[in-house]
Amino acid sequence: MWIADGWNDYEVIDCSEGEKLERWGDYLLVRPDPQVIWNTPKTHRGWKKMNGHYHRSSKGGGEWEFFDLPEQWSIHYKELTFNLKPFSFKHTGLFPEQAANWDWFGDRIRNAGRPIKVLNLFAYTGGATLAAAAAGASVTHVDASKGMVAWAKENSRSSGLENAPIRWIVDDCVKFVEREIRRGNHYDGIIMDPPSYGRGPKGEIWKIETSIYPFVQLCTKLLSDNPLFFLINSYTTGLAPSVLTYMLSTEVASTHGGTVKSDELGLLVTRTGLVLPCGSSGRWESGK
């Protein structure tokens, strides 16, 4: 398991009865987590003194309840700054477990010894974009949500990366990749964080179990002659790490060599010292 253990401003304090107690900077949040099927005692004071609590509804969705929580605040990871604000379906605008991947591809970029172009697809609020840019890459950031791209730009300014070579694109990721292929553009690194389910601007349906493999095949056409890495993230329990390994092995390593590794991502739980699973990642990297 790849554990994001480099945080100072974030921690999972405890988890029990379908919820996790987290510290985001100076504030405590309680949010639902489907992986938390145990009912260990909730002894930490934060369970009763949280600043925000997302209550899931039996009808689907849910709502936030706030206790002295600002509308927006920020936390830091190494040289990066992220602006947080609770919004729909329990989210805050950041997935802290992804820091394990930021460190991995950041090291690859810094040690490449050449200019690196990175494509970040389904790029959300830009955690991976900023990590790649801070490591020295030129990044193309693509997300279908105008609001998410605006949030990512805000994070870039807060991180002092407003002048970094980042291209911000609001577009359907599949359509964008198809156009980039026609344009003849290529990238040394590709990152994708696809949703389990989604709809495109013209009603196109994205279902990860049936859409991800042809999309990976499509994206390989954008790899440069000397690619550096390819990263796939999945929060869908049906896509085991071994599935990600198989895809990257057949579609990337078969052509470019290198190595493929896939594993769960995790966050340490302070109270127990155990690890909370947070999805999976598949990594291909060149042997160069």
Residue ranges of model-derived segments:
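Conserved class I S-adenosyl-L-methionine
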Residues: 114-124
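Mobile active-site "lid"/loop adjacent to the S-adenosyl-L-methionine
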Residues: 146-148, 170-174, 187-218
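S-adenosyl-L-methionine
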Residues: 145-191
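Short glycine-dipeptide loop
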Residues: 218, 223-230
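Conserved SAM-binding motif I beta-strand of class I
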Residues: 138-143
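C-terminal catalytic and target-recognition region of SAM-dependent MTase-like enzymes
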Residues: 227-288
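Non-catalytic substrate-recognition/targeting regions of SAM-dependent transferases
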Residues: 5-22, 29-96, 103
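Conserved SAM-binding loop of SAM-dependent methyltransferases across substrates and taxa
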Residues: 125-137
